[in-house]
Amino acid sequence: MVQAIAIAPHMEVVGSDGVHVGTVDHMDGSDQMKLTKTDKDAGGEHHFIPLAWVDHVDQHVHLKKSAQDAKAQWKAAA
């Protein structure tokens, strides 16, 4: 499992298909990432992605889900 400490602000998040999902704003606790609201796909809202969706981290955060699935299932900030 990926450690939350491996994820840093401003890292690009990509789906399993290599398509851009968003940009990390910061880790929210130890189990979810908060994405920036200024990203082109964010619609002006922060979105949360569970750490459980992360496959691995290198210079990007790679998800186990495709970008389309991640965006369909991410949680908007209240």
Short names for language-model regions:
Residues M1-A78:
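Peripheral interaction segments used for macromolecular assembly
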